[in-house]
Amino acid sequence: MALPFARCWNLYRWGTKRWGVTAGESRRGISFKLEEKTAHSSLALFRGDTGVKYGLVGLEPTKVALNLERFRDWAVVLADTTVTSGRHYWEVTVKRSQQFRIGVADVDMSRDSCVGADDRSWVFSYAQRKWHSMLANEKAPIKGIGQPEKVGLLLDYEAKKLSLVDVNRISVIHTLQTDFRGPVAPAFALWDGELLTHSGLEVPKGL
């Protein structure tokens, strides 16, 4: 159920590390941790807030109390750093989850929505052993990838593109055309297992 303040997006405030990463600051790309204030109660962070694992609601809930930044209805968490320009690359170890979404989202997207279900988030989803790109709850299949141990994400803010990357071949698997209107943050959703993020990486040569 939505709370009375559910639409007060302009009141959002991030943690102490929350800032915009600009092109001049991104030689090594975005460096981030996961922001526990945004994490749904079914999610728990680990390994210095770089990993997230799924648990039944009430079994291993986040220790953060309900607040304006927290996702209320879906198992979503955002990173603690935003991007406003430049090209950025990070990787996600996905081998321990069978159902997840990874991508980016506007920092002020509705906390009653799930990433990929609205037009303010852009993600790649994995479920039932199949990959899809997602925007506004519309799915497009991505074939020939399987479930690798790790995948990369390449964000080009000015070109408004988000790409899924094969980390072994260092090649783009699929690209989403986006419509960024403001700061975006890496975004993650999962319904089993765990995801581990790897940031502060240089954009690989050839991408």
From Swiss-Prot:
GO cellular component, as recorded: nucleus
SMART domains named in the record: SPRY (SM00449)
N6-succinyllysine PTM positions: 139
Modified residues (N6-acetyllysine): 53, 130
Domain B30.2/SPRY, residue spans: 12-207
PANTHER family: E3 UBIQUITIN-PROTEIN LIGASE MIDLINE-1-LIKE ISOFORM X1, E3 UBIQUITIN-PROTEIN LIGASE TRIM36-RELATED
Protein name: SPRY domain-containing protein 4
The species this protein was found in: Rattus norvegicus (Rat)
